[in-house]
Amino acid sequence: MTTGSMLEVPPAGRSAVFAPGFGQRVLLTVDTEEEFDWRAPFRREGYGLSHVAAIPRFQTFCERIGAHPVYLVDWPIVQDARAVEVIGDAVRRGTAEVGVQLHPWVNPPFDEEVSVSNSFAGNLPQGLEAAKFTLLRDAIEAAFGSEPQIYRAGRYGLGPHTAPLLRQAGIRIDTSVRSLFDYSHQGGPDYSNHPLTPYWVDPEQQLLELPVTSAYWGPLRALGPLIHRVQRHMPTFYSGFSRLRLLERIALTPEGVSAAEAMRGVDLSIDAGLPVLVLSFHSPTLAPGHTPYAASEAQVEALYGWFEAVYARLAAKGVRSCTVAEIIAATGG
């Protein structure tokens, strides 16, 4: 088994080929996690789970608009009976899937110091990353009666040993790479040069990377990676280009991205020929007061409006929802 570091840009020739007729699809991923203060230092305790009560409405909404969410579940969620009941019902009915999301600071074993660096699971010692992941993966399978096939490292925190760990655990898809983004200033990965198209992590084509979709828009979009590298040293450098509408980095998320911006990102991604557009957001945003993106009920309603508009645009472009299982099958799994 030869599996390189997922922190590195893949070598040429690793792009995944999808089966004829697959077309262009959309996958909705939900970072399904505890509520915590994003502005405060990381803590093992003191989190909440009250927003779980809002998940049934979201699931019903998804079924109405034709979305098929993948709930990427972390340790506090899988330990919560209400969350397991709500998500498990959708999984059993075939209207949702469940995957793994590792937040190491709230996931046993608790053998590391809680810090910003250690909030990226890939920065942990190899054995500790594996121990935390294995406990979580096994708990998810036991709780939902379904073997998870997809993984996202919390905070997109892959590491040099993550790829063989995922392969050994039978994970078929990773979706931790957030292309065009750089977290190295916090001690995390730099994905600014990683491709947007799905690619194989390993030459044996057992582990597929499905990057979270972002796109550069504007006259200077070809210079996007360079401009963002300069921003590391000049924090206000990029904002001027954005304000003048010369360059925008558009992530396909309702968190901090307007529907109009997202639809530009959708159009760019479709025109670029991406086989799968990967949308993402955090489950606590489904209720007010838990994330910076939904401080009020009105902002929660705006999130639903965002999904209505974006999925209508996708439908108009002929882009249908897909599942993790369909992606695995379409790439030869």
PLM regions with names:
Residues 2-9, 13, 153-272:
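Active-site-adjacent pocket scaffolds in enzyme catalytic domains
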Residues 75-157, 205, 214-216, 283-284:
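Metal-dependent polysaccharide deacetylase catalytic core of the NodB/CE4 family, i.e.
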Residues 38-44, 110-122, 289-295:
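Surface-exposed, active-site-proximal loop segments in enzymatic domains
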Residues 109-110, 185-190, 223, 287-294:
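Histidine/acidic-residue-rich catalytic or RNA/ligand-binding cores of hydrolases
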Residues 6-92, 279, 313-318:
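Active-site beta->alpha N-cap acidic-glycine motif
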Residues 55-59, 84-88, 130-137, 163, ...:
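Generic structural signal for well-ordered alpha-helices
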Residues 239-333:
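C-terminal domain-boundary segment and adjacent tail
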Residues 26-30, 69-71, 98-102, 149-151, ...:
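Hydrophobic faces of well-ordered beta-strands that scaffold small-molecule active sites
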